[in-house]
């Protein structure tokens, strides 16, 4: 008798769009501006420190919460960047990437039947983690033109079942950033409630035009109820290493670690020592990251002006949204496949970031975390649209 496979726990989930488009790009020899990974080298100092860590014997299980030397370095960086003192022992947990940290945070505090508010468009790992926790995602759309938060709509979405609110700044896919006024609105909304917060800040150092990243760590009244998530992969151009971390108050960290220890237990040990050395000895790397990517953004946007694609503003992050309505009226998922197969440039549609995409929206996401030669090759093809 055939084995009876139980019904899927994630009926709305298929293969992630990032994998789909990267595979399509490889099959058709397209320039891949879809998936958000750099195609230039990681800092040589980081490679040297990784090699040193392995040669010095840091090759066995790291402590479950993370190597002490890295947690101490993160605490020093948080104090330097945001003026916040965090306890490296009780408040910092090193994770196998930011996605693991987000999953852990949701599963640490959300119970079946509860609700999690998600601001759409949102990174596609949020909703499956919520569903696997037996909870329901309540999706509140951002302004379709500016990707600003409508705080009245967020307030209207709060119910007695609301346990968690997810925020992301700088925002993927738009690059929009929370302002100080947004943080005050957020604090007022959560004050006196049982609602907790996950703040996805993986692009924290990639901010442009003199803006300030409003980390939740700057706001004590928010920090006391928050998991703040970041990623070394985004900061040091090494997305394949999959190392991130979460900062939360001791009581929340204790619950977070209960999930973490039975999920991955610990994270790649040599990389933890390498990142600790980089934070300690080369703080200028994250301090200069915004200028590094702003130069790429400005050059790429200037080139896009010579195409029929309309670039939207990019305050932070390393993605450029483009309006393709002058090129095609195809839905975005069809347009990006056509663009990849017929024109040789891979992009990401916006619809997978939404529960209910805005009708008639014609936007695609391009990644400019690439070598100039890669971007030039893409622009040459886009100019032919």
Q: What is each stretch, according to the model?
A:
Residues 2-97, 104, 278-281:
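N-terminal small-domain helix-loop-helix segment of the aminotransferase-like
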Residues 108-130:
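Conserved PLP-anchoring active-site segment centered on the Schiff-base-forming lysine
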Residues 219-255, 267-270:
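Active-site PLP attachment segment
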């Amino acid at each position: 008798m055939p084995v009876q496979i139980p019904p899927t726990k994630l009926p709305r989930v298929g293969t992630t769009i990032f994998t789909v488009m990267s595979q399509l790009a490889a099959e058709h020899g397209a320039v891949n501006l879809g998936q958000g990974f750099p195609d230039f080298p990681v800092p040589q100092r980081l490679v040297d420190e990784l090699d040193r860590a392995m040669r010095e014997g840091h090759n066995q299980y790291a402590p479950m919460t993370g190597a002490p030397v890295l947690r101490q370095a993160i605490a020093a960086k948080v104090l330097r960047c945001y003026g916040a003192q965090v306890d490296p022992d009780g408040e910092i947990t090193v994770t196998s990437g930011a996605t693991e940290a987000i999953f852990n945070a949701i599963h640490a505090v959300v119970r079946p039947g509860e609700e999690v508010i998600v601001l759409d468009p949102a990174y596609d790992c949020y909703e499956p983690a919520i569903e696997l926790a037996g909870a329901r995602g309540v999706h509140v759309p951002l302004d379709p033109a500016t990707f600003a938060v409508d705080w009245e709509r967020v307030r209207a979405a709060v119910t007695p079942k609301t346990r968690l609110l997810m925020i992301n700044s700088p925002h993927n896919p738009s690059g929009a950033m929370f302002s100080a006024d947004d943080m005050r609105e957020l604090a007022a909304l959560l004050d006196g409630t049982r609602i907790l917060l996950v703040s996805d800040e993986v692009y924290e150092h990639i901010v442009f035009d003199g803006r300030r990243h409003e980390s939740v760590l700057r706001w004590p009244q928010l920090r006391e109820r928050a998991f703040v998530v970041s990623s070394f992969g985004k900061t040091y151009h090494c997305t394949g290493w999959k190392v991130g971390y979460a900062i939360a108050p001791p009581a929340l960290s204790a619950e977070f670690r209960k999930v973490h220890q039975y999920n991955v237990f610990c994270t790649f040990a040599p990389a933890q020592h390498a990142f600790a050395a980089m934070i300690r000895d080369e703080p200028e790397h994250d301090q200069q990251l915004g200028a590094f990517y702003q130069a790429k953004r400005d050059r790429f946007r200037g080139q896009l002006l010579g195409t029929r694609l309309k670039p939207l503003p990019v305050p932070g992050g390393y993605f450029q949204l483009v309006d393709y309505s002058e090129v095609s009226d195809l839905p975005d998922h069809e347009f990006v496949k056509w663009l990849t197969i017929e024109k040789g440039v891979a992009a990401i549609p916006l619809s997978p970031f939404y529960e209910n995409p805005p009708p008639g929206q014609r936007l695609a996401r391009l990644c400019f975390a690439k070598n100039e030669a890669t971007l030039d090759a893409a622009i040459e093809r886009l100019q032919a649209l």
